[in-house]
Structures are given as C-alpha cells and as structure tokens.
Amino acid sequence: MAPWALLSPGVLVRTGHTVLTWGITLVLFLHDTELRQWEEQGELLLPLTFLLLVLGSLLLYLAVSLMDPGYVNVQPQPQEELKEEQTAMVPPAIPLRRCRYCLVLQPLRARHCRECRRCVRRYDHHCPWMENCVGERNHPLFVVYLALQLVVLLWGLYLAWSGLRFFQPWGQWLRSSGLLFATFLLLSLFSLVASLLLVSHLYLVASNTTTWEFISSHRIAYLRQRPSNPFDRGLTRNLAHFFCGWPSGSWETLWAEEEEEGSSPAV
C-alpha cells in the first residue's frame, strides 16, 4: 500500500473517530466521576459494562464504515440477458435507467454516489462521518449502531456530569474540571445529533423509505406521480424486511404490484 493511502479521507475520519472515542473514555476514567469511584471501590461490573458498550459501538462504527453498502455490480452483462432481466423485473411504465456516470443499469431505488463513484442499491445517504454510503446492505447495521452509540453517549453524559464540581474558585475549577466540562459539552452535542438521526431513521424504516427518497420524492421518476409510498407494506412487514430480509422480493416486483392495484378498477 502506498504511503499516501494512509492519508485518505476514510483512514483519517475513522482514525479520528477512534481516537476521540477512547480519548473521551479516558477523560471519564481519570476525573472524579462515578465511573472512577466504582473502580476505586472495587465495583467493576458497571465500568466493564461501559467499556464493552464503548468497544461495541466502535466495532459497529468500523463495520458500517468499511462494509459494502450495496454497490451495483459494474460487470457488463450480455445485451439479451439485460433485456430479459428488465422485462422480468421492471414494468414498462418505469424502465431501468442507465447511470450516466458508471453506465450500469440502476435497479429501482438505486442512486449514484459521487463521493464513492458507485451506484448503491436502496441508497439512503453518504455519511461523511463514516466516509461511506448507507445503503441496502449496511443500513440495518447503521440503525443498530446509532442506537448503541446513543446509549453510550447518554451514559457518558451522565458520568461527565457526575464529576463536575461547581463550587470552587474559578482558577481551581478550570484546572480540575475544565477538560471534563468540555467533554460534557461535546457529549451533549453528539447526543443531540445521534438522537435526531436515530429518530429520523426509525421513522424512515417504519415507512420503508430512505433519506434520499424522503427529500427528493418530487424529482424521482418512480415516486413523483404516486400519491403514497409504493414500498410501504405496513409497520410490521417494513421492520421485518428491513432487519430480517423477510418477506423477500425485489423492489421492482413490489412496485409493479402496487401499480396494478392502483390501476385496477374499483368493484
């Protein structure tokens, strides 16, 4: 690997996240927080639980940021095979669209990411904090990561607050609690962002839509002339399909079924 590859945006972002995660954890252990008090009293269950949650959130972060989000295969296929696939999967009203950047036929709900330079299946968004797309393959893990990360952040926020001492002279307080207070503010900001992200993504999952579709539905060919979301199968089935892949089936098939139901005359 070339030396300059170590300075790629992905490496820098993931290294920064890892350093920040363990740096904040170290601050919570070094100051007079409940975490340190438990450790000094020999009550190691809660400190170990906190460390395991931090480690779990970090491993989930790395998994989501490094895994294939659902890239569309760029290998060329025979023309006849493409025609058969298009006929079988996509209704005539909405033919497969060829990406003008990577020249692949995009499945329904796929979109080209300019940062990754690839088309991604069930594209949600490109996450700059992970330097990776969130798509069909890693979106469920992304939601699980957000939930675990929020638990860690809120617990860390409580621990930071437990170590703050306000009734001290200004200079002494700054030396003893300045870094911990800065950590508290940072955790407050991260907790707010993680909460908003988790709530918004749970809403998207519950309605079987994506960030891109929610924001740009008026510009997306398969959504802009539909009065409702054609992929919404109800809360239970949406959650089951998102997290467990059940019931299975292509988005093209589901879209076609909804189109037939919408066009069939009322009895």
From Swiss-Prot:
* Cytoplasmic domain ranges by topology: 1-9, 65-140, 200-267
Membrane-spanning parts: 10-30, 44-64, 141-161, 179-199
Q: Which GO terms describe its molecular function?
A: palmitoyltransferase activity; protein-cysteine S-palmitoyltransferase activity
Q: Please report which protein family the annotation says this sequence is part of.
A: Belongs to the DHHC palmitoyltransferase family.
Q: What is this protein called?
A: Palmitoyltransferase ZDHHC12
Native species of this protein?
Homo sapiens (Human)
Q: What is known of its domains?
A: The DHHC domain is required for palmitoyltransferase activity.
- Give the reaction(s) catalysed: L-cysteinyl-[protein] + hexadecanoyl-CoA = S-hexadecanoyl-L-cysteinyl-[protein] + CoA
Q: Which gene encodes it?
A: ZDHHC12
